[in-house]
From Swiss-Prot:
Gene designation per UniProt: 5MMP
Lipid-linked residues (GPI-anchor amidated serine): 337
Enzyme class: hydrolase
Motif Cysteine switch: chain residues: 117-124
Name this polypeptide is given: Metalloendoproteinase 5-MMP
Source taxonomy: Eukaryota, Viridiplantae, Streptophyta, Embryophyta, Tracheophyta
Entry-linked InterPro entries: M10A_MMP, MetalloPept_cat_dom_sf, Pept_M10_metallopeptidase, Pept_M10A, Pept_M10A_Zn_BS, Peptidase_Metallo, Peptidoglycan-bd-like, PGBD-like_sf
Glycan attachment positions: 25, 36, 78, 168, 191
Species in which this protein is naturally found: Arabidopsis thaliana (Mouse-ear cress)
Length: 360
């Protein structure tokens, strides 16, 4: 047990501790911070527009790496610049999942979707897509789950969360996560309480940069924004290199004038969905849609989100699903519960096998 606890402590205090950047309003962001943040990514992929099967184009190997990262390509080995059947199949599935016209070609709408900031969790696992995009027989339900439908045990309806201590987050930032947890608590029987102990908490949240020990390195601003594990592992990692905007929680959806700032609550609500067992959805208005444009704020659960989470846990017994059941904050300390951490360390080893993210 001592060895395991030491491993946990080493993980949190040696993997690229970072002071993430938070802004309370757009005007406080230095102008140079948000100039052409996605230009490099677009320039990298825009030259691929219009190419089709049978061609060999410089840069297609990077696109294949992107598709492999998110589960659309399952083959191993080096990626080539050949537009082959494997790539065409990946494009077809991607277009279907994101409600694009299925052409198997790299049209501009597909490429523009690819360069949008997004969640780092894959859309397909073991080559199987659960997003249901474009399926005729299931037109209203597009939510998905992790393989095997993992969920928190029925006996555990009071979950605790803690923040990685090296981030030194302010109370203002922590309140953003409290609001995000509340949105899921309002429609389920789950309750969420903040703890000060990462060893005692069910869920641990941290901001990291680049490679941070779980095999899923972050790529800098405006790429992958965050990733989270399925239950009951309970890890939520966010990219500390993003320009995170902290709103006051009064506006549920808006488009900000600066398109390279990322709304923290929007990402937090999405990743908590993963922590509770939801996969990605092909409903663009749903919280669990994989991508979010820079400057967008989306925090209200859609019908698809609510139906998905209630499929796992049922509704809120204290209301009709829309009542207020705020997450609680406490000063819990101590504790040496490590059962969850065994699952975490096994998960980290599994995740690190072959997944990596292209930098563009």
């Amino acid at each position: 047990m001592r060895t395991l606890l030491l491993t946990i402590l080493i993980f949190f205090f040696t993997v690229n501790p970072i002071s993430a950047k938070f802004y309370t309003n757009v005007s406080s962001i230095p102008p140079l911070q948000f100039l052409n943040a996605t230009q490099n990514a677009w320039e990298t992929f825009s030259k691929l527009a219009g190419c089709h099967i049978g061609e060999n184009i410089n840069g297609l190997s990077k696109l294949k790496q992107y598709f492999r990262r998110f589960g659309y390509i399952t083959t191993t080995g080096n990626c080539t610049d050949d537009f082959d059947d494997v790539l065409q199949s990946a494009i077809n599935t991607y277009q279907k999942n994101f409600n694009l016209k299925v052409t198997g070609k790299l049209d501009s709408s597909t490429l523009r979707q690819i360069v949008k900031p997004r969640c780092g969790n894959p859309d397909l696992i073991d080559g199987v897509s659960e997003m249901n995009g474009g399926k005729i027989l299931r037109t209203t339900e597009k939510y998905s789950f992790f393989p095997g439908k993992p969920r928190w045990p029925k006996r555990k309806r009071d979950l605790t969360y803690a923040f990685a201590p090296q981030n030194n987050l302010t109370d203002e930032v922590k309140r953003v996560f409290s609001r995000a947890f509340t949105r899921w608590a309002e429609v389920t029987p789950l309750n969420f309480t903040r703890s000060e102990s990462i060893l005692r908490a069910d869920i641990v949240i941290g901001f990291f940069s680049g490679e941070h020990g779980d095999g899923e390195p972050f790529d800098g601003a405006m790429g992958t924004l965050a990733h989270a594990s399925s239950p009951p592992t309970g890890m939520l990692h966010l990219d500390g290199d993003e320009d995170w905007l902290i709103s006051n929680g009064e506006i549920s959806r808006r488009i900000l004038p600066v398109t390279t700032v990322v709304d923290l609550e929007s990402v937090a609500v999405h990743e908590i969905g993963h922590l509770l067992g939801l996969g990605h959805s092909s409903v663009e208005d749903a919280i669990m849609f994989p991508a979010i444009s820079g400057g967008d704020r989306k925090v209200e659960l859609a019908k698809d989100d609510i139906e998905g989470i209630q499929h796992l846990y049922g509704g809120n017994p204290n209301g009709d699903g829309g009542g207020s059941k705020p997450s609680r904050e406490s000063q819990s300390t101590g504790g040496d519960s490590v059962r969850r951490w065994r699952g975490w360390m096994i998960s980290l080893s599994s995740i690190a096998t072959c997944i990596f993210l292209i930098s563009v």
